[in-house]
Amino acid sequence: MERLLIVNADDFGLSKGQNYGIIEACRNGIVTSTTALVNGQAIDHAVQLSRDEPSLAIGMHFVLTMGKPLTAMPGLTRDGVLGKWIWQLAEEDALPLEEITQELASQYLRFIELFGRKPTHLDSHHHVHMFPQIFPIVVRFAAEEGIALRIDRQPLSNSGDLPANLRSSQGFSSAFYGEEISEALFLQVLDDASHRGDLSLEVMCHPAFIDNTIRQSAYCFPRLTELEVLTSASLKYAIAERGYRLGSYLNV
C-alpha cells in the first residue's frame, strides 16, 4: 500500500544559508515542503527564492519565541522581542492567549502578503503550538481557514476532540534531528511509522548551509549533515522501495 511522505524543512526565512539549504534539498533531494518564519531576518530572500521553485509547498512557521512580533505583545515580549521564556509562562499558566490569537492572525495575513497565497499548512517554531493552552487556538484557526496543521500526537491526549474538517498527516516525526543524523536514521523513522500503520507521515528537518546566523544556533553543523543526507540518491531510492510517495499537505 502506497503511503504519503511529507518531508518538511522548518525555518524558511531564518537566514540566507537556511534558505539556500532548503531550496537545494528540494531541487536535488527529497524535501517537498517548508514552513516560513514571516518575521525572519531573511524572509524576503526566501520569498524571492521560492518564485523559482514552484514545486516547493510552503506553509507558515508560527513564531512566538524569536525576533519581534507583528503586533504589540506586552504579555509575552521582553524589551520588545520574543524569547524562550514562553515555557516559564506556560508552566505558570500565564500565557497572554488573546495576544497570541491576534499575533497568529497577523502572521497569517503577513504570509499571504509575502507569498501571494495561503500557506499550505501551519506549524510553529519550537513546537509552541502544541502547548495545551495554545493548541485549541491554532486548531480553531486552521479549521476556519481551511489549512492543514502539523500535529504531534505523542504529547496530545485530546486528539479525538479535533474538528472533523481539520486536515493533518496521520503521523509526525521530529526524530531526524541531533548529532547522529544519517540515512539509516531517516529510514528508521519511516519503518517506525509503517509499523504504526500511518498512511501519511510528516518528517521534520532543518537542512542548511552554514552562515553567521546558523553559527549562532545551538543546532548548527547537523543542519549541513541533514542537507547531505536529504540530497542522497540512495535515500530517495530507499524511500520509494518502502512504498512511500513524496508529497505535501496539499495531498492530505
From Swiss-Prot:
Matching Pfam families: YdjC
Keyword Transit peptide set for record: no
Single GO molecular function: metal ion binding
Positions of Mg(2+) binding: H61, H125
GO cellular component: cytoplasm
Entries under Gene3D superfamilies matching the protein: Glycoside hydrolase/deacetylase (3.20.20.370)
UniProt keyword terms in alphabetical order: Carbohydrate metabolism, Chitin degradation, Cytoplasm, Hydrolase, Magnesium, Metal-binding, Polysaccharide degradation
Cofactor: Mg(2+)
Biological or metabolic pathway of the protein: Glycan degradation; chitin degradation
Its EC number(s): 3.5.1.105
Keyword Cytoplasm set for record: yes
Subcellular localization(s) per the UniProt record: Cytoplasm
The family this protein is said to belong to: Belongs to the YdjC deacetylase family. ChbG subfamily.
Subunit record text: Homodimer.
Entry function: Involved in the degradation of chitin. ChbG is essential for growth on the acetylated chitooligosaccharides chitobiose and chitotriose but is dispensable for growth on cellobiose and chitosan dimer, the deacetylated form of chitobiose. Deacetylation of chitobiose-6-P and chitotriose-6-P is necessary for both the activation of the chb promoter by the regulatory protein ChbR and the hydrolysis of phosphorylated beta-glucosides by the phospho-beta-glucosidase ChbF.
Protein name: Chitooligosaccharide deacetylase
Organism: Escherichia coli O8 (strain IAI1)
